[in-house]
A protein has these predicted regions:
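ATP-dependent carboxylate-amine ligase catalytic core
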Residues: 1
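Alpha-helix boundary/capping detector
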Residues: 40, 110-111, 149-150
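C-terminal boundary of histidine-terminating zinc-finger modules
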Residues: 106-119
């Protein structure tokens, strides 16, 4: 389930209604976005909510122009999510670049994740990391239960 950044009623409602296997927090590398990611991670880790954080994904990690596919421009900062993952002892599941082909492919019904490109590879690596993280969570932890609210 894709949720808005931070912590809000929608996050609480979700964990009250659905036994969530785990949370994957997505952020861009700049400080203001990382602050929201920290709040989200902290919320899921509270004793009352107790939803395992499976990992962190850095979106828009760098910009790569189509005409210079090997160039990386860190327009939102560099390695913000990697540093946060290390600090909070969670897995960095992947880094997704900001490239025009993502938008174009989506608009044309051609997902870049299926292409043999740097971006396609990033999405494939992310998918493998997510599967491994879920497998690890399921081996090491009991199933998550819905959050019970007492009145």
């Amino acid at each position: 389930v894709d949720l808005p950044p931070g912590t809000s009623d929608i996050h609480l409602t979700l964990v009250q209604e659905v036994p969530v296997t785990g949370a994957i927090v997505v952020s861009t590398p700049q400080e203001v976005a990382l602050a929201d990611a920290i709040k989200g991670i902290a919320m899921f880790r509270t004793e009352k909510i107790n939803v395992p954080v499976l990992g962190l994904v850095e979106n828009m990690s760098w910009f790569t122009p189509a005409e210079l596919p090997s160039n990386k421009y860190y327009i939102f900062g560099k390695e913000g999510c990697r540093k946060l993952a290390e600090k909070m002892d969670i897995t960095l599941l992947g880094q997704i670049p900001l490239v025009q082909s993502i938008c174009e492919g989506s608009d044309n019904g051609e997902p870049v994740a299926l292409n043999d490109t740097v971006t396609g590879s990033a999405f494939n690596e992310l998918a493998v990391s997510v599967v491994k993280s879920i497998e690890k969570r399921n081996r090491e932890q009991r199933p998550t239960i819905k959050l019970e609210i007492s009145k």
